[in-house]
UniProtKB/Swiss-Prot annotation:
Activity regulation (record text): Binding to the viral RNA polymerase inhibits amidase activity.
Broad class of the protein's primary localization: host cell
Keyword Membrane: no
Subunit relationships: Interacts with the viral RNA polymerase.
Residues annotated for Zn(2+) binding in this entry: 18, 123, 131
pH dependence: Optimum pH is 7.
UniProt name for this protein: Endolysin
A single GO cellular-component term on record: host cell cytoplasm
Amino acid sequence: MAKVQFTKRQETSQFFVHCSATKANMDVGVREIRQWHKEQGWLDVGYHFIIRRDGTVEAGRDQDAVGSHVKGYNSTSVGVCLVGGIDAKGNPEANFTPQQMSALNGVLHELRGTYPKAVIMAHHDVAPKACPSFDLQRWVKTGELVTSDRG
């Protein structure tokens, strides 16, 4: 089967952090998320990176391709998804592991090296959603992981 060819992103202004909205006991990766996205009618996984519970970073869409993760921002952003983000009742929960947060820090650091003018944003900064279920700006500034249900 031929690989889907996506439009190349011409500009990178933002890095968006997302969560998979899965429970802490669900260790899913790019394969499962790709399947979920295809079931929604997408051609492929919408994120550029997925960070599993153990901190493993998996590649999704090609880093220079237009993603499908934030309506209105896909052509200017890179999407990073942390696996987890909800509790047993489906409510937002910052249940991410230290390994995930360390990996997120590393991914964002590398992206900043490639795209130094881009800003780090949470999905809930531009959409009425809880995603990524934590206060990203607080974490960036202090390293403190605090649940947020913004949206």
